[in-house]
Each structure stands twice: as structure tokens, then as C-alpha cells.
């Protein structure tokens, strides 16, 4: 029975960045700190998509694979889809495994545009592309950062099962009200 199950507590930081995007220290240092200094159980790197080059995406996937140890320290490969609010706003995208396609909101700060055909310029395009490629194991949540997510404009409950209500950016009760007004089921 679920009621008889012991409640387990896990500590994690799912949204951090490194010097390759807008943070400090390398991505390697970020995961090393999360595991060996902060003693987290789970961690994810959410670099802004328009700053993640093909080279860094490959490197980031290699780092998450290296640090992921089942039942010890879980890493979640992913990125921050960083569309402007009028296009759906920030979404954190997490994959259950490495080497997935990064679908950027733009290549604004990336010179190499050889994979620009994978860009999704709106949150709805992101959800449609995940559906088209049968990536229903992808987890997306609406993020209230610099370009706050507009879940009234774009939402797909098959991927976006949660919204960010509180972070170091502040508390965002309005996003819960938006979800209820739209009849969304969120956790």
C-alpha cells in the first residue's frame, strides 16, 4: 500500500548554470560541487539554449553521463528553453538519458547554425516537436525566470506536469492561478 510506504527525502538542485552559459565555474565543477560539496542526491544543468553550442551540448551530456550513479547521485541532462514570454517563456527541459536533440528557442549567441532546423521558436513548437519525435519521456516545467513562462499561451500536460512556484527569483503564485483558470492539472 502507498500509505504504508516509508517517505524518503531527496535533496536536489535542478536548475543551475556554469560559465559556458551565465554561471560561474565549469560544468564539470558544477556537478562535482553538487555531488561532493553540497551532497545533493540529484542535479541538472539548465543552461540557456541560445548559448549552448553543439560542442558544449556534447560535453554536457558526457559530464552528466559520467556523474550519474544510480541510487547514489542522479544527473538529469537538459537545458533551459529560453523563449521570450510572448512566445511561451522559459521552460526547463529534462531528458531521462543523454544524447537527445536540443531544440533551441534561437541561435542568438551561437555562430554555428548548422543545426538551426531543430530550433523551436515557440513553446507550442517545442511541444509539437517532442510529440512528433515520440519523446513522451521528456519532462518540461514552466520556469519563472527572466522570461517568465506563459502557460496560458502554451502548455502540453503530456510533457509539462509541473510549474515553478518558488525559486531564488521569487514566489510566483500567479502561475498556479493561471493553471487553475485554464483547467490544467499540475503538480
What are these regions (language model features)?
Residues 1-187:
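Extended, charged catalytic domains and RNA/DNA-binding interfaces, predominantly
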Amino acid at each position: 500500500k502507498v500509505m504504508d510506504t516509508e517517505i524518503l527525502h531527496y535533496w536536489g538542485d535542478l536548475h543551475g548554470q556554469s560559465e559556458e552559459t551565465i554561471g560561474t565555474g565549469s560544468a564539470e565543477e558544477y556537478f562535482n560541487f553538487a555531488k561532493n560539496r553540497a551532497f545533493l542526491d540529484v542535479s541538472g544543468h539548465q543552461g540557456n539554449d541560445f548559448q549552448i553550442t553543439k560542442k558544449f551540448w556534447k560535453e554536457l551530456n558526457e559530464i552528466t553521463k559520467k556523474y550519474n550513479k544510480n541510487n547514489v547521485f542522479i544527473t538529469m541532462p537538459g537545458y533551459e528553453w529560453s523563449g521570450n514570454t510572448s512566445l511561451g517563456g522559459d521552460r526547463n527541459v529534462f531528458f531521462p538519458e543523454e544524447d537527445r536533440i536540443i531544440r533551441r528557442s534561437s541561435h542568438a549567441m551561437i555562430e554555428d547554425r548548422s543545426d538551426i532546423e531543430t530550433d523551436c521558436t515557440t513553446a507550442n513548437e517545442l511541444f509539437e516537436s517532442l510529440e512528433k519525435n515520440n519523446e513522451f519521456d521528456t519532462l518540461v516545467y514552466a520556469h519563472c525566470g527572466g522570461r517568465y513562462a506563459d502557460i496560458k499561451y502554451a502548455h502540453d500536460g503530456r510533457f509539462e506536469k509541473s510549474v515553478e512556484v518558488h525559486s531564488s527569483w521569487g514566489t510566483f503564485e500567479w502561475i498556479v492561478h493561471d493553471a487553475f483558470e485554464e483547467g490544467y492539472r499540475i503538480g
